[in-house]
Every structure is written in C-alpha cells, then in structure tokens.
Design a protein with these regions (language model features):
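Conserved active-site-proximal phosphate/metal-binding subdomains
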Residues: 1-135
C-alpha cells in the first residue's frame, strides 16, 4: 500500500506560498500539457511551465544549457526579475511545477488543504471498509 505522497506542487497554490499571484494564476490556467522538463533555469532537469524562455533554449542552433550550478549564472538575474516584475515577465518566468498542475485550480489556505486531505482520506477509508463488508 501507499506509504507516502509527493505533494510539492500543491504548496505553490496556497496563500502562504512565497511565489507571486501572477505565478499562481499561470498554474491555475495550466494543464499537464503546458509543462516541459528543461535544464534552462537550473542546469538540472526540472519540470516547469513552458514559455518563451524554455522554447528559446530548445530551439535548434541555440546553445545547450550549462550544468548546475553554472546555468543559474545565466538565468539568476532573469529569475530575480520575474519575482520583482511578475506582470511584465510572464513569458519568461521560472514556474517549476509537476504534471499535477492541471488539478490545481484555486489558491487555498494551507489549513484548508490539510482539512481537505483529511476528509478525502477518511472518505477513502470508508469506501474501503464498505468493500470489506460486502464479502
């Protein structure tokens, strides 16, 4: 059975997250098809939302990303600019997120996420218990 869960992307869509409202709007509008694994920001493969930045690094004839940590010397100022001017840098912003992004539609409080997960867990346990009672 399951012994854990990967939940990193969920925390990008909570009120308490340190990312910008513009990033959260981009996540809410995206589907899994809007993501790509790219080394263009960190030098290591990272799933993120596709945009003009990621497409430029994938364009034939353009240089390959450097390895980590050197690639961040190329992208670090761009990442800082997207945090400082999020409305003006949407097309080149670093928006790391998993393929689950298509299920993240609204910004919630962290406490609401935990309460929802507990409810969903209890509902699932109830359904499993009902299956055991059938036999």
């Amino acid at each position: 059975g399951c012994q854990g869960a990967w939940s990193g992307s969920q925390w990008l869509m909570v009120e308490e997250a340190e990312n910008t409202a513009v990033q959260q709007q981009a996540y809410a509008a995206a589907s899994s098809r809007d993501t790509v694994r790219s080394r263009s920001f960190t030098g290591k493969p990272c799933r993120m939302l596709k945009n003009d930045w990621t497409r430029a690094w994938e364009t034939p004839g353009n240089p390959e990303p450097l390895g980590m940590p050197l690639q961040y010397m190329v992208s670090g100022m761009a990442v800082a600019a997207t945090r400082r001017y999020p409305e003006r840098t949407v097309d080149v912003a670093f928006n790391p997120v998993g393929q689950v992004v298509g299920q993240l539609h609204a910004v919630e409080r962290t406490s609401a996420v935990i309460e929802r997960w507990v409810r969903e867990y209890l509902d699932a346990c109830g359904r499993l218990e009902a299956l055991n009672d059938v036999g």
